[in-house]
Structure formats: structure tokens, C-alpha cells
């Protein structure tokens, strides 16, 4: 029969007391939020002044999440009319961001994207207020 002299208990308590004084690994979310790396794939930001409404981001998206609406101005150049994303289908893969030739579409640090209603998941990044041409809109 084995003799129990309490060495196992003392080893366990020593480990517990050693870990007790270390910095905790977890954060008290949502009171404290961790700093995210710069290349984090969060939500999206569209710099509408840079966007040329080429539609490359729309074509690059594997789930067809992006809808780019465009109009033609007086010089017959395409201008951005609307930019919408169905976020419920987005994989956050970044192919749309990589495809943008002018870096108009970028990721931001926002990651709290949960919504209560499914209708609120649609992300409208740009909607032109006034349409100056009478030609209407076309998809890029």
C-alpha cells in the first residue's frame, strides 16, 4: 500500500499560488477591448471620392455580396451612385479589398457587427443623394 504524505497536495498548491500572481490571459469584454492588428479583417470603409465604380470588387466577391450602382456624368464617365453589401453572406476573405485598383474599399477595426433583425445586416456604404443626369442608373 502506498503511503500518502501530502506531497501531491503541496505541489498543486505551489502551482496555484505561482499562477495566482501572474497577469490574467483573458480580458473583461466588453469593458476592455484588445488592440487589433492593423491588417484585421473587420467591417468595411468605402472612400467614395476614390471609387471609380469599376465593379472589380463586385466581380471578385465569391458570394456576390457587393452591389455597385453607377451613373454616367456629362463627360460620359461612370460615377458611383450606390454601394451596398449583404453582410450576412460575407466571408471577410478580403478579395474585394485586394481587387480595388484605387484602394477605395478598405477594412476597418470594427468587429461588433451583430444585429437583432436580419434587415439591419445590409451595409450601405454609399448612396448618392441627388442624381443630376436623366439617364438613370446602371450596374457596373
From Swiss-Prot:
Recorded superkingdom: Bacteria
Principal subcellular localization: membrane
Major enzyme class: translocase
Cofactor note: Binds 2 [4Fe-4S] clusters per subunit.
Membrane topology label: Peripheral membrane protein
Listed EC numbers: 7.1.1.-
SUPFAM superfamilies (UniProt xref): 4Fe-4S ferredoxins
One GO term describing the cellular component: plasma membrane
Residues annotated as domain 4Fe-4S ferredoxin-type: 42-71, 81-110
Keyword entries, A-Z: 4Fe-4S, Cell membrane, Iron, Iron-sulfur, Membrane, Metal-binding, NAD, Quinone, Repeat, Translocase, Ubiquinone
InterPro entries reported in the protein's UniProt record: 4Fe4S_Fe-S-bd, 4Fe4S_Fe_S_CS, NADH_quinone_OxRdtase_chainI
Required co-factors: [4Fe-4S] cluster
Binding site for [4Fe-4S] cluster 2: 61, 90, 93, 96
Gene3D superfamilies: 3.30.70.3270
A Pfam family annotated for this UniProt entry: Fer4_7
Quaternary structure (record): NDH-1 is composed of 14 different subunits. Subunits NuoA, H, J, K, L, M, N constitute the membrane sector of the complex.
Family membership noted in the UniProt record: Belongs to the complex I 23 kDa subunit family.
Protein name as catalogued: NADH-quinone oxidoreductase subunit I
Amino acid at each position: 500500500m502506498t503511503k500518502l504524505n501530502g506531497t501531491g497536495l503541496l505541489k498543486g498548491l505551489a502551482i496555484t499560488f505561482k499562477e495566482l500572481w501572474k497577469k490574467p490571459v483573458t480580458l473583461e469584454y466588453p469593458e476592455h477591448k484588445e488592440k487589433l492588428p492593423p491588417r484585421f479583417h473587420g467591417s468595411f470603409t468605402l472612400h467614395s471620392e476614390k471609387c471609380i465604380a469599376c465593379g472589380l470588387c463586385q466581380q471578385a466577391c465569391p458570394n456576390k455580396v457587393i452591389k455597385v450602382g453607377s451613373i454616367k456624368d456629362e463627360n460620359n464617365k461612370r460615377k458611383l451612385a450606390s454601394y451596398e453589401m449583404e453582410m450576412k453572406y460575407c466571408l471577410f476573405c478580403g478579395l474585394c479589398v485586394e481587387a480595388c485598383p484605387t484602394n477605395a474599399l478598405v477594412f476597418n477595426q470594427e468587429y461588433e457587427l451583430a444585429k437583432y433583425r436580419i434587415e439591419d445586416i445590409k451595409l450601405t456604404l454609399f448612396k448618392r443623394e441627388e442624381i443630376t443626369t436623366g439617364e438613370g442608373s446602371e450596374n457596373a
